[in-house]
C-alpha cells in the first residue's frame, strides 16, 4: 500500500474508517479501527475511543499515535484489525498482512 501525507484538510468524505496505530511499552506496533471520528477544526481530528482498547492504553502511555484510513483494496485486512484485539493476538498487524514503519513525526508506527 502506498502512503500519502494529505496534510491538514478540513473534511473527510466519504466517512472513512480511521486506523489508530501506537507502540506498546515494548515497542510493538498495534492498531485499532475508530469509526467515530471526524475533523473538528481545520487541522484537528476528534476521535471517540474506549479506554478498554490496548491501543488506547498505549496512546495514554506514549502520548503518540498515527492515523491511517482504510481503502477498498484492504477492506478484509482493516476489518481484521478492527475485530481482533492485541490483548489476545499481539501480532495482529502482521497477521492482517500489514507492515509498519516508524513515523518521522511522532513515536508511533505508520501502516
Predicted features along the sequence, with ranges:
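Active-site-proximal mixed secondary-structure blocks
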Residues: 1-32, 38-111
Amino acid at each position: 500500500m502506498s502512503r500519502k501525507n494529505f496534510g491538514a484538510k478540513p473534511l473527510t468524505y466519504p466517512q472513512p474508517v480511521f486506523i489508530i496505530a501506537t507502540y506498546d511499552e515494548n515497542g510493538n506496533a498495534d492498531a485499532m479501527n475508530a469509526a467515530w471520528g471526524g475533523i473538528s477544526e481545520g487541522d484537528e481530528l476528534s476521535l471517540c475511543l474506549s479506554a478498554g482498547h490496548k491501543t488506547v492504553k498505549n496512546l495514554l502511555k506514549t502520548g503518540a499515535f498515527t492515523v491511517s484510513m482504510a481503502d477498498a483494496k484492504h477492506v478484509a485486512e482493516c476489518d481484521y484489525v478492527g475485530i481482533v484485539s492485541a490483548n489476545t493476538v499481539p501480532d495482529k498487524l502482521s497477521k492482517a498482512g500489514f507492515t509498519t514503519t516508524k513515523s518521522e513525526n511522532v513515536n508511533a508506527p505508520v501502516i
